[in-house]
Amino acid sequence: RICISTLAGVPSIVFGLFGLAFFLNTIGVSESKSVLAGALTLALLILPTIIRSSEEAIKAVPNSYKEAALGLGAGRWHTIMTIILPAALPGILTGMVISMGRAAGETAPIIFTAAVSIGAPIALLETLTQPTPALPWNIYNLCTEHEAVDEIRHVQFGMVFTLIAIVLLLNLIAIIMRARISKKLRG
């Protein structure tokens, strides 16, 4: 738990530098920035959040469920797989979707591992090993490096609105999924 809490507190730029050093320079998942390196780095970034939300969801399952299943003769693994995990599933899925929303808005990790300002169209098979244009990076780029910042302000606002809409949509999906799964589990 201490390690997960520590990882959750690490700034995203540190994850980006780690992704650059480990996935690109050490392992060499691709020759340069790539979607795969960015995805692996973002997966590490959101892992603590998913673990913590899953842990909390499992803890929230009433102890009486476990005791009832064990009392009726179910084994430990059978109880975990058929009683505890299905009851915790709404919380686990909610944590996963909210974590994806966080990953969608992160700029620092993808600056080092995946993003380019403008990308040329690439073949589908080469998608994972090539750099990609990314919305958060383009927003940052337009705000800091464009020559006519005032003239393209509407583009910046549109991109920010799109990013916020994506994150809100992911959160809404998490809420709907949680409600539907909870309703199914209750019967």
Model-inferred region functions:
Residues 1-8, 24, 28, 154-157:
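Alpha-helical membrane-interface segments at transmembrane helix boundaries
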Residues 110-164:
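Interhelical loop and adjacent transmembrane-helix boundary motif
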Residues 64, 75-76:
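Short coil/turn motifs that cap or connect alpha-helices
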Residues 24-49:
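Loop-to-helix entry region at the N-terminal start of transmembrane alpha-helices
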Residues 1-19, 52-53, 186-187:
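Cytoplasmic-entry segments and transmembrane alpha-helices of multi-pass inner-membrane transporters
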Residues 55-59, 63, 70, 97, ...:
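C-terminal transmembrane helix and the adjacent membrane-cytosol boundary/short C-terminal tail
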Residues 53-54, 76-114:
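Transmembrane alpha-helices
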